[in-house]
Amino acid sequence: MANYSTSEFKSGLKVMLDGDPCSIIENEFVKPGKGQAFSRVKLRNLRNGKVWERTFKSGDSLEGADVMDVSMQYIYSDGEFWHFMDQTSFEQKQADETAVRDAKQWLKEEDICEVTLYNGEPLSVSPPNFVELEIIETDPGLKGDTAGTGGKPATLSTGAVVRVPLFVQTGEIVKVDTRTGDYVGRIKQ
């Protein structure tokens, strides 16, 4: 892979650090009044999700990580692994708990997800930005019960719990933003 100099660091760049693939979250170039310029970089380890803050002198370089982001279809979960399929080659990959992390609460069969692969193995899974899921359990909204914030918890078909307006009932399908976990709207059938 290519080497990236500190002047090429930007948010989202994937590099190797201490033998692990990392993604740059933040990069701040600092030029003190006296001394050599440096870059203060915040990186996320793609294997375990830990965030590191490192300082690099101006002119230092890091090796680029051989990481690919691939759109794959979620097929099923067998309890231990989540299985994904490449829609062009029909090749299947299985991701473990550490790769799926919080995305598991939004995954619905046949959804298209962004899977980050390193050496052909899934490192992380990003669900679609919006998903449509059925409410399997929520309290009934009583007429005139609007004194509070106007929301109630609802359990979705995947097990996720989101706050929904009082008028939403069990059995309805709602649209949820997976990045924030917020209710967006209800889907008419």
From Swiss-Prot:
Pathway: Protein biosynthesis; polypeptide chain elongation. GO terms for biological process: peptide biosynthetic process. Belongs to the elongation factor P family. Involved in peptide bond synthesis. Alleviates ribosome stalling that occurs when 3 or more consecutive Pro residues or the sequence PPG is present in a protein, possibly by augmenting the peptidyl transferase activity of the ribosome. Modification of Lys-34 is required for alleviation. One of its GO terms (cellular component) is cytoplasm. CDD domains: S1_EF-P_repeat_1 (cd04470), S1_EF-P_repeat_2 (cd05794). One of its GO terms (molecular function) is translation elongation factor activity. SUPFAM superfamilies: Nucleic acid-binding proteins, Translation proteins SH3-like domain. May be beta-lysylated on the epsilon-amino group of Lys-34 by the combined action of EpmA and EpmB, and then hydroxylated on the C5 position of the same residue by EpmC (if this protein is present). Lysylation is critical for the stimulatory effect of EF-P on peptide-bond formation. The lysylation moiety may extend toward the peptidyltransferase center and stabilize the terminal 3-CCA end of the tRNA. Hydroxylation of the C5 position on Lys-34 may allow additional potential stabilizing hydrogen-bond interactions with the P-tRNA. Its main location: cytoplasm. PROSITE patterns: EFP (PS01275). It comes from Alcanivorax borkumensis (strain ATCC 700651 / DSM 11573 / NCIMB 13689 / SK2). The modification N6-(3,6-diaminohexanoyl)-5-hydroxylysine is found at K34. This is Elongation factor P. Keywords: Cytoplasm, Elongation factor, Hydroxylation, Protein biosynthesis. Gene3D superfamilies: 2.30.30.30, Nucleic acid-binding proteins. It is found in: Cytoplasm.
